[in-house]
Regions:
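Glycine-rich loop at the start of a catalytic domain that most often binds anionic cofactors/ligands
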Residues: 65, 69-78
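Internal, conserved structured core segments that host functional sites
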Residues: 91-147
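Alpha/propeptide regions of enzymes that mature by internal proteolysis
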Residues: 30, 34-61, 67
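Short beta-strand segments
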Residues: 10-11, 61-62, 102-107
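N-terminal glycine-rich anion-binding loops that anchor highly charged ligand groups
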Residues: 7-25, 35, 39
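Short, well-ordered, mixed-charge alpha-helical segments that flank or form enzyme active sites
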Residues: 17, 67-70, 110-116
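A glycine-rich helix N-cap at a beta->alpha junction
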Residues: 75-95
Length: 148
């Protein structure tokens, strides 16, 4: 079994542990600081998992909203954090052909998903549907296609 040495992690916020409502992920809400705390805990758990699997290099892309949710000093020291926008490749900024694995943490269901929590695709107010190679897809599918 080949161990993934170079791992890329894209982390969104809407489906991190215990998040169930839009009020928790909007930067101007009182619940946002709680969501940021949980977001970094989920991220650091994913980083630990990648390290346990043999990762030697880990790149993280803060992928929620304006992409400034994670404080660098809170992120596991084994990872390199990319944050802020604009990013040409948006949620997967920093991924390259040299990465052996991609992880998607906190990703949510696409817009229109029955009973999906915080379902949307890119921007719920402007994007209604995205089709890729004849299939409707959400952020996970779009970013996986970019990742290769």
């Amino acid at each position: 079994m080949v161990k993934p040495e170079r791992v890329f992690i894209s982390i969104d916020m809407e489906r991190i542990s215990s998040i169930v409502d839009w009020e928790e992920v909007g930067k101007d809400t009182k619940e946002y600081q709680f969501a940021r705390k949980i977001m970094v805990q989920d991220l650091n758990a994913a980083i630990e998992g990648a390290l346990d699997a043999g990762a030697k290099e880990i790149m993280v892309s803060d992928a929620h909203g304006r992409m400034r949710n994670l404080r660098p000093e809170d992120v596991h020291e084994a990872a390199v954090l990319m944050r802020g926008s604009p990013k040409p490749d948006s949620m997967v900024e920093g991924i390259s052909e040299g990465h052996d694995a991609a992880m998607y943490v906190g990703y949510h269901s696409m817009k229109g998903t029955l009973n999906g929590i915080c379902s949307h695709t890119i921007s719920g107010s402007t994007v209604q549907r995205v089709w890729f190679n004849g299939r409707e897809t959400g952020e996970f599918g779009m970013n996986s296609a970019l990742a290769g």
